[in-house]
């Protein structure tokens, strides 16, 4: 007789999970292909815009120990780590060129079953005046593009050290009479107290899914094909399809308690990007009495000529404040500063509430 409890022991489940991740990576053969030579050609670039102020201040290096609702973006394996019955977060990021990114998510803890979460990301690019060759100053028409990602997350504990998580995302882009829909999956693992207490390992693959393709009435044009004999008629322009910006991240972190009031957390991550330079990220967080948090991060890309992969500068800064000690509500405020070249600097604000 098969003993299912033994069959699905902790070690077996870890091996099975790692096997699934490897199969997922291998089945998406292009995940490690290309790089910077394909920058700007991916579908759904909004998938790569970080949200939340807590871990953005660490430059995204906290793959191994990200927890709570901000972990949805960085590593869904950490979503369960919030020791509360329910949680909510709202985040707002001032992006480049008058664009901004809003993020809201809620989660519920269902005991041994795990944690379920729903998230919504919206990239607001503002209104765009329509221009043509004949009317370069504008036709008077205004289009308002919409870009959003609706996500469903599942996270649970496999043992006292191991957690897993996955995001299932619906992607929608719509503007000027055309639209495109897509689906993507993120999957991650976190392993705590690896070899020694405080040392954690995190692995995550993100944005796995099929290509996206635009469709809609704006792709129809009027033309006259003399060979058809049909006169002036409508023809549909064949839109190209574009791959999602897949990436793979491997991270380590180490947390050290200096005393009862002071805590230091070091984090680092390697990120292999399908449509950009590979990144090395490092972060440092200082926590005082679990009330005040000071954060900083640094990123460099050896493949880039100046160690910087894009218009964003190498470093990030931020701070956090936990108001639980001063009120009856478990509320945390976070801020992240991202310096930018050519555009205004990015400011990200977020508020987290636990119930």
Pin down the residues of each PLM region:
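N-terminal secretory signal peptides that target proteins for export/translocation
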Residues: 1-12
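Charged, low-complexity surface segments at secondary-structure and domain boundaries
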Residues: 3, 19-21, 43-44
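A compositional/structural signature marking long, glycine- and acidic/polar-rich segments
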Residues: 11-15, 290
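Bacterial N-terminal signal peptides
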Residues: 17-28
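Subset of outer-membrane beta-barrel
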Residues: 30-355
């Amino acid at each position: 007789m098969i003993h299912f409890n033994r069959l699905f022991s902790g070690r077996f489940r870890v091996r099975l999970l790692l096997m699934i991740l490897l199969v997922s990576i291998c089945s998406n053969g292009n995940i490690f292909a290309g790089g910077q030579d394909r920058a700007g050609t991916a579908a759904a670039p909004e998938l790569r815009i970080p949200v939340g102020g807590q871990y953005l201040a660490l430059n995204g290096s906290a793959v191994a120990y990200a927890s709570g609702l901000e972990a949805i973006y960085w590593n869904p394996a950490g979503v369960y780590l919030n020791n509360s019955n329910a949680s909510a977060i709202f985040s707002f990021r001032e992006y480049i060129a008058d664009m901004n990114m809003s993020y809201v998510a809620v989660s519920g803890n269902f005991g041994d079953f795990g944690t379920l979460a729903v998230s919504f990301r919206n990239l607001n690019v503002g209104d765009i005046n329509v221009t043509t060759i004949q009317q370069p100053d504008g036709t008077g028409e205004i289009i308002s593009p919409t870009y959003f990602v609706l996500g469903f997350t599942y996270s649970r504990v496999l043992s006292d050290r191991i957690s897993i998580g996955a995001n299932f995302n619906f992607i929608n882009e719509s503007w000027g009479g055309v639209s495109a829909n897509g689906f993507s999956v993120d999957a991650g693992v976190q392993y705590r107290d690896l070899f020694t207490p405080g040392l954690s390992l995190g692995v995550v693959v993100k944005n796995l899914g099929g290509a996206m393709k635009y469709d809609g009435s704006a792709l129809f044009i009027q033309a006259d094909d003399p060979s058809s004999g049909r006169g002036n008629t409508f023809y549909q322009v064949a839109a190209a399809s574009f791959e999602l910006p897949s990436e793979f991240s491997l991270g380590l972190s180490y947390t050290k308690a200096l005393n009862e009031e002071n805590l230091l957390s070091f984090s680092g991550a390697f990120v292999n990007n399908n449509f950009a330079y590979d990144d090395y990220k490092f972060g440092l967080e200082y926590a005082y009495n679990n009330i005040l948090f000071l954060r900083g991060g640094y990123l460099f890309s050896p493949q880039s000529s100046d160690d910087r992969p894009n218009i964003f500068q190498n470093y990030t800064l931020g701070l956090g404040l936990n108001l639980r000690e001063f009120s009856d509500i478990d509320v945390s405020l976070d801020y992240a500063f991202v310096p930018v070249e050519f555009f205004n600097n990015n400011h990200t604000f977020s508020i987290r509430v636990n119930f």
